[in-house]
């Protein structure tokens, strides 16, 4: 049954806009029987500005493009060495609300890092995952027709300097950290593999079907 099956798509390195439009298309065209999916991807350097985003939080983008997008939250950075995961989930079918989905995503990251003896936690007033008040994962979702898209970004082994060109998630002086510094997963592939396990467990998926890349129908 589709309720207990999660399709996991490994997209490799893909530009942000093409993946964004693909997840919009999937969400717009899905119906009650369309399977839930989790897309795992890395993006080239890009700043994305959420719907609540204020331009003053983009300090000095330089040669990195800024894209205005339709997710919640403020500005963030994506780049090589960062695990990006997009849960395309029918939350109406799962009978959970958006707050529960956010909590499940945050807990999936916290539990994954626990496996490396890294003590991470979420904050009620600032979505994402933190270690010693430094942010290791950012979160921004959109719900349309009872289904989620956009998702999370986990810093793994990347050039962190572009975060200094913005106020990450709208917080001036927020310090970012990455898994490599913390003794967590050392590669995006390793982090993705571990996160798929904790995420699917927390959302109650019993069957995982793995795919490489996107097909025209995404199914």
Swiss-Prot record:
BPL/LPL catalytic domain: residues covered: 32-207
Superkingdom of source: Bacteria
Cited Gene3D superfamilies: Bira Bifunctional Protein, Domain 2 (3.30.930.10)
Pathway as given in its UniProt record: Protein modification; protein lipoylation via endogenous pathway; protein N(6)-(lipoyl)lysine from octanoyl-[acyl-carrier-protein]: step 1/2
Gene Ontology molecular functions: lipoyl(octanoyl) transferase activity
Active site (UniProt): 169
Compartment annotation: Cytoplasm
Pfam families to which the protein is assigned, alphabetical: LplA-B_cat
GO biological process: protein modification process
Keywords assigned by UniProt, alphabetized: Acyltransferase, Cytoplasm, Transferase
Family matches, as InterPro entries: aa-tRNA-synth_II/BPL/LPL, BPL_LPL_catalytic, Octanoyltransferase, Octanoyltransferase_CS
Binding locations of substrate: 71-78, 138-140, 151-153
Entries under PROSITE patterns matching the protein: BPL_LPL_CATALYTIC, LIPB
Site, Lowers pKa of active site Cys: residue positions: 135
EC number(s) on file: 2.3.1.181
Similarity remark: Belongs to the LipB family.
Purpose: Catalyzes the transfer of endogenously produced octanoic acid from octanoyl-acyl-carrier-protein onto the lipoyl domains of lipoate-dependent enzymes. Lipoyl-ACP can also act as a substrate although octanoyl-ACP is likely to be the physiological substrate.
UniProt-recorded name of the protein: Octanoyltransferase
Organism: Shewanella sediminis (strain HAW-EB3)
Gene name in the database record: lipB
């Amino acid at each position: 049954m589709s309720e207990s099956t999660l399709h996991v798509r490994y997209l490799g390195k893909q530009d942000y806009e093409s993946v964004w439009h693909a997840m919009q298309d999937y969400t717009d065209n899905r119906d009650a029987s369309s399977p839930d999916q989790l897309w795992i991807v890395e993006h080239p350097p890009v700043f994305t500005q959420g719907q609540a985003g204020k331009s003053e939080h983009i300090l000095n983008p330089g040669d990195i493009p800024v894209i205005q997008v339709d997710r919640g939250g403020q500005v963030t950075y994506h780049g090589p060495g960062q695990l990006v995961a997009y849960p395309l989930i029918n939350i109406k079918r799962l009978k959970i609300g958006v707050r529960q989905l956010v909590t499940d995503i945050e807990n999936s990251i916290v539990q994954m890092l626990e496996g490396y003896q890294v003590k991470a936690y979420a904050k009620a007033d600032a979505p994402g995952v933190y270690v010693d008040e430094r942010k290791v994962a950012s979160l921004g979702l959109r719900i349309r027709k009872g289904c989620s898209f956009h998702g999370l970004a986990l810093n793994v082994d990347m050039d962190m300097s572009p975060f200094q060109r913005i106020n990450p998630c709208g917080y001036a002086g927020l310090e970012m950290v990455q898994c490599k510094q913390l003794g967590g997963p050392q590669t995006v592939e390793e982090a993705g593999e571990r996160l798929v396990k904790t995420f699917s467990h927390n959302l109650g998926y019993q069957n995982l079907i793995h795919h490489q890349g996107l097909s025209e129908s995404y199914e």
